[in-house]
Amino acid sequence: MREFSEIIKARDWENQEVTHQHVVQAHAPLHAFHSKQAALDNQASEFQQLLNGQWRFQLFAKPEAVPNHCINIDFDDSAWSDITVPSNWQLQGYDKPIYTNVKYPFADNPPFVPADNPTGVYRLNFTLPTAWKERKNTVIFDGVNSAFHLWCNGIWVGYSQDSRLPAEFDLSCHLQAGDNQLTVMVLRWSDGSYLEDQDMWWLSGIFRDVCLLSKPLISIRDITVSTELDACFNHGSINVVTQLSEQSSQYTAQVQLFDAQLQPVTKLVGAPFGERMIDEKGPANDRAEHKIAVPSPHKWSSESPYLYRVVISLVDNEGQVVDSEAYQVGFRVVEMSNGQLKLNGEALLIRGVNRHEHHPEKGHAISYEDMLVDIKLLKQNNFNAVRTAHYPNHPLWYELCDQYGLYVVDEANLETHGQFPMSRLSNDLSWLNAYMRRMTRMVERDKNHPSIIIWSLGNESGLGHHHHAMYQWTKRRDPTRPVQYEGGGADTAATDIIVPMYARVNKDITLPNAPDVVPKMAIKKWLSMPNEQRPLILCEYAHAMGNSLGSFDKYWQAFREYPRLQGGFIWDWVDQGLTKIDDNGDNYWAYGGDFGDQINDRQFCINGLVFPDRSLHPTVYEAKKAQQFYQFSLVDGDQLKVKIDSENLFIESMDETLCWSVTEAGYVIASGEMELHVTAQSSKILTLLESYPEQKIGCDYFLNIEIVLNKDKPWATKGFVVATEQVALASIAQLTNVPLIESGAPRLSEDKNKITVAGTGSGAEFELEIDKQQGVISQWLVRGENKILQGPKDNFFRAPLDNDIGTSEADCIDPNAWVTQWDTAGIANLVPHCIAIEAVTLARSVLVKVEFGHYVENKLLISSHWQYTINNQGEVQIDVNVNLAKSLSPLPRIGLELILPDSEKPVNWFGRGPHENYPDRILSAHIARHCCSIEEMHTPYIFPSENGLRCDVKDAIVGDLTVSGDFHLAVSRYSQMNIAQAKHVNDLINDHQLYVRLDAFHMGVGGDDSWSPSVHDEFLLNKEHYHYQMILAFN
């Protein structure tokens, strides 16, 4: 027996060569079914017992502070608190969460960790079922962060680290009939923490299930299931390797395959152990092998995830079933062929996302229900793949991916991003075993899942000898799947696929201080390198941090154009915000530094496509549209015909309806629907109208298409929209201005302070006052009521986006970041001066000209020339010319802002929507007549920034204001400066007034990454002169 004092003295958690002690060898998940029927039906096993629930808990400052008697079976823990298992103790009122992206939250001195090492001790009393006593009983911890020692009934059992894979211990010789006691000492930091630097919250504790498993003394120890298909992918076979817990000739393994309705597909086939010769020394007597032919099996894919069920039973010499296991089986073949990744002979297009396991209240302790929400959202938004960034996921995740149809890149729990260089530990021989176990144990646990199509060696650990060893072992252990790894350049000998991060479509990414070094080539260029025949799949791309995902569609144009560009995985799925309550009792989502964690990387954990509660970011719609499985094009001719191309590889569209409409100036003038039948990888031409609708001068015409489900699916209900398209139809342009209504000019008067323009306004008296000192409309009366709180002013500023700020680490600011350039120029501090103002009465209007200069420290940066044309109907046409200093960096926006009284009326507009969109993110936002509440016009990004824009607007109604022209629209109750200064949504101050921002031009948001200027050139405002016009009026 190992004494407690010896354990403390040994400090296994600071020895990289001690990764485990007395841990059971890794294997596929086991359930210990008592019969074949129970295994077939997947009944709850009587030989499994979850130990989740309330445990006794105490947190100590360091392992040395733990009293040695707390491991005793009779220790009185009544003064301790209860804690929920599974959970992270930082979210149960102990210690504090820490977020870092790259740097370690402690001194980088591997394998040593801080002396102040929070240590949680868990205790649980449980009762062993009487029927279990003469069996082999193990306890399985599915996830404990970061390392732990285990005692049973006061006796030390073993030690484990690796937070994301199971640790199983044999308790058979420690258990007693009736009551038993477990004690677990969990350390926050261990040498394993150096391998788990994965751009997420550092959280601790028993955060996955704890389970007791009882097996016969001689039982099934492991099972490997694989499938094969013939060269034509018509007929197949299932291969099953069954391993015994010890060598014996007294048993037979029996295997039978059942279909999705649990009807038998094959006969029951038995095989003895030790039948096949392994080498010249003979067979393995603990191994039985089956290869069973399966004619014309249903094949598994993300589109049609058909699952069989294989039941494996251990039968003794008397014909009695002593142990049974069962697994879901998908018939599919993954291969690399002709420079492409293929499944069942078809080249895949990966519509992928990186996904952290995260819950805003439970941290890393996620439930089946939480996982199911993610699965359905992924399917609904046209994702077909997920990368388990950057660690093996909860075992249930893979079952759901098997069932619902998602391709999985299963990634080892390995990242050393904070090392200098990153490969420091990857070449240190003393760390080899730690690396290898993280790979080998993942493969052994997850090998039977059809959804897993690629193994990954980990993330951002440089490239070292250990990676080559991991790669070679994996290829030999499982030749049925490719292996990928980005480290060392994304195209090394340790990867079967080129898997770069954040490589651009057409532009090489160079190092600032080494312009001749090309660490990331443009993805199109990469394919053309000499002797390069591998496919390219971006393991991370399109950094979705806040208001992002600009120019995302360009990646998808390239993916569809180049067959060896086979998609990628967006970074990432969910904002890793944690729920916190402020002093006013309001909830908000916290990020790095919000818990007093001094070493942190602020909001860099907030880069998901969905909020922590899984409500959607606007960027999701863009991803869904770009990734959709149907493409549309208009067919030339007199009839309204559309060509539909199906990107489904395996299934015909049998459960979908095509709904279409034609709009004139946003109003539907024709519509229809038809059942959609398009075979996989084929096209179909449909005639929607026998002739084009008659056109009116000056109206815009659009064809709008939706593909909707006409029956329920496991992941969505009938009526759900899976694909959309909008096609601009020919229109007759308005060649001349629409003549104004015949009437006289409004009345003009002025004094030394103001210019006043008054008129009848279609029967309603109006009066405008323009302040001569400011050059701005100071009052706009209609029927005696003032309609504005502040008149239109130049607006060149936006509250900085994460992509504008440009940093991935809190202390590493990019001097080329947009916000740095704007701050240097003083854009946020421009001081406007009215240089000249004059007014004149024309035949039917009053013309007011104003000249502005915008200065920083008496230096003129921007001049703007405004011309108000005010007619007797109360309409104000605003023409603006803007001139920029040659030295000025591209501006974030050029337009105007005015302030209106608060209103509960919804905003109506004819333009892109209904969701937020920006000039480089408009693919999913169709032009139509939209209506949203004021609240819906605001996007509550966790780190507040510019938001809520709607592009390409022709006309809009905000409160009593009507606007027409060509502009982008944003409406908010928050000022731009408040948004810019706020760190969280609870810092936003509702001013109970409406800020109406009318942009003629707006810079793109970018999003190829978030730490360098990533807005594409065509979406930069880099001209020296701009002109725009719009018309304002009040009802």
Swiss-Prot record:
Keywords: Glycosidase, Hydrolase, Magnesium, Metal-binding, Sodium. Pfam families: Bgal_small_N, Glyco_hydro_2, Glyco_hydro_2_C, Glyco_hydro_2_N, LacZ_4. It catalyses: Hydrolysis of terminal non-reducing beta-D-galactose residues in beta-D-galactosides. One of its GO terms (cellular component) is beta-galactosidase complex. SUPFAM superfamilies: (Trans)glycosidases (SSF51445), beta-Galactosidase/glucuronidase domain (SSF49303), Galactose mutarotase-like (SSF74650), Galactose-binding domain-like (SSF49785). GO terms for biological process: lactose catabolic process. Its cofactor is Mg(2+); Na(+). Substrate binds at N101, D199, E460, E540, Y541, A542, H543, N607, W1011. Binds 2 magnesium ions per monomer. Binds 1 sodium ion per monomer. The active site is at E460, E540. NCBIfam families: PRK09525.1. This is Beta-galactosidase. It comes from Psychromonas ingrahamii (strain DSM 17664 / CCUG 51855 / 37). The lineage of its organism: Bacteria, Pseudomonadati, Pseudomonadota, Gammaproteobacteria, Alteromonadales. The gene is lacZ.
